[in-house]
């Protein structure tokens, strides 16, 4: 479904009506890619504070492009990248389901998608283990 229990919190799928087109792999791909047309809205998976928002070239070939990280507390955070544009900025508090950006293909990307990661205390968690997409 579009709602998942992660730790003590409830997270929602950030790009409703679209599923992932590339899954999490332990070696290099630390999230899922949600393929959707350019300009499709992306929503905050859970409430929190935006800790980083902007264009990231990244090291080691990450190249997240327009991306943001939301700190949800209790060691949990989510990352959304390759966005066409962002609607929030660092330091801003966001609510679950709030518009945070739009699907795009910025940075090291081969097509329109939202790269979505869930992290807990610096560890990457495979989103497909929590969402039935």
Report the location of each language-model feature.
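Surface-exposed, glycine-biased beta-strand/turn segments
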Residues: 1-66, 96, 125
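A residue-level detector for short acidic-glycine micro-motifs
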Residues: 23, 36, 52, 82-85, ...
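Short hydrophobic beta/alpha edge segments that flank linear recognition/processing sites
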Residues: 34, 66-70, 95-109
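Ser/Thr-centric signal marking residues that sit
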Residues: 40, 78, 106, 110
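Zn2+-dependent peptidoglycan hydrolase active-site motif and core
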Residues: 45-90, 112-120
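Extracytoplasmic low-complexity repetitive segments enriched in small/polar residues
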Residues: 53-54, 92-99, 130
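Short peripheral tails and domain-boundary helices/loops at the edges of structured domains
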Residues: 77, 119-133
């Amino acid at each position: 479904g579009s709602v998942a229990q992660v730790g003590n919190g409830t997270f929602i799928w950030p790009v409703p009506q679209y599923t992932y087109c590339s899954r999490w792999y332990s070696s290099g791909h630390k999230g899922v890619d949600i393929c959707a047309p350019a300009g499709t809205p992306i929503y905050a998976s859970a409430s929190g504070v935006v800790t980083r928002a902007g264009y990231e070239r990244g090291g080691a070939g990450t190249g997240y492009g327009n991306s943001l990280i939301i700190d949800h507390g209790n060691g949990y955070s989510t990352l959304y990248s390759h966005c066409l544009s962002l609607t929030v900025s660092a330091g801003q508090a966001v609510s679950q389901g709030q518009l945070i950006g739009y699907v795009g293909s910025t940075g090291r990307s081969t097509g329109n998608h939202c790269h979505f990661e869930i992290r807990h205390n610096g560890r990457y968690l495979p989103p497909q283990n929590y969402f039935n997409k």
